[in-house]
């Protein structure tokens, strides 16, 4: 079974009729759409509302997305046709983002409920805002809420072929970044930590073929012995003989990689560094 089929199967086993998902990882798993990883910016343009909501209908085995119109073309390019869009960011006309979101979600939920007023609805308790809950209660007044997070965890526990390929690709991108760090450590130059970080980010994005969301830490010299994460990168100039630790996590098509390595710049490691 693919990921979506596993979710439908698990929902039916648990007696869950619908699920309303907001976790970007879960949306990617059931729909194939990778929600762009810009959480702070997304909150600004959508008034803090979810930029993408996935409605999972176990009985019909259907997925419907309710998304900001900023993602319309990206979703269409993904090949998804079952989606509706609400107007979010605009600076040229009067616009009520809250009302737009609620009306679109209400319409999509109404289609999924198909007149049924008493359904078991799965929600992600740590993600769902009250505005989304209020729409569910309005459309399905006699609904019972269950924890969809556990359903998704159960479905995702055993990886599919698509998962394995996605994780392998994310690991390849992380490797490209670490290889760039090693390459710099073998060829002396005039670098700050920030200079190296930008080169590493560029290597990761080049390997992925697109701008790659990237978090982590790069520290050099005396800061490598501290544990107050994150301590870098900073504008500190890298010196010959400096040890460095780089811990990075790129996100590629909805999958995270995590990799940490250490190098010594333009010199062999001393006894303390080896220890």
Describe every region a protein language model picked out:
Residues 10, 177, 203-207:
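Short alpha-helical functional segments enriched in proximate histidine and acidic residues
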Residues 135-140, 184, 199, 203, ...:
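Alpha-helical structural signal in soluble globular domains
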Residues 171-182, 193-201:
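Active-site pocket-lining segments that scaffold enzyme catalytic pockets across diverse folds
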Residues 120-125, 182-193:
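Conserved short loop/turn motifs at secondary-structure junctions
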Residues 1-176:
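A composition/biophysics-driven feature that prefers long, compositionally simple stretches
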């Amino acid at each position: 079974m693919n990921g979506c089929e596993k979710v439908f199967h698990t929902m039916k086993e648990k007696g869950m009729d619908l699920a309303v998902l907001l976790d970007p990882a879960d949306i990617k798993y059931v729909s194939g759409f990778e929600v762009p990883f810009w959480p702070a910016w997304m909150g600004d343009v959508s008034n803090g509302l979810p930029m993408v909501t996935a409605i999972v209908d176990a009985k019909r085995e259907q997925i419907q997305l309710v998304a900001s119109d900023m993602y319309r073309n990206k979703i269409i390019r993904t090949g998804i046709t079952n989606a509706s869009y609400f107007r979010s960011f605009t600076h040229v006309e009067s616009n009520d983002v809250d009302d737009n979101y609620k009306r679109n979600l209400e319409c999509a939920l109404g289609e999924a409920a198909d007149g049924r007023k008493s359904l078991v609805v799965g929600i992600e308790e740590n993600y769902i805002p009250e505005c989304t809950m209020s729409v569910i209660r309005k459309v399905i007044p006699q609904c019972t809420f269950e924890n969809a997070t556990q359903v998704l965890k159960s479905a995702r526990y055993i990886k599919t072929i698509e998962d394995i390929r996605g994780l392998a690709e994310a690991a390849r991108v992380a490797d490209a970044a670490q290889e760039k760090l090693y390459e710099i450590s073998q060829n002396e130059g005039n670098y700050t930590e920030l200079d190296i970080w930008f080169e590493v980010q560029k290597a990761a994005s080049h390997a992925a073929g697109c701008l790659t969301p990237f978090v982590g830490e790069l520290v050099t010299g005396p800061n490598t012995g501290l544990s107050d994460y994150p301590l870098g990168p900073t504008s500190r100039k890298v010196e010959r003989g400096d040890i460095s630790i780089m811990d990075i996590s790129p996100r590629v098509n909805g999958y995270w990689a995590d990799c940490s390595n250490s190098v010594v710049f333009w010199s062999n490691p001393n006894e303390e560094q080896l220890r």
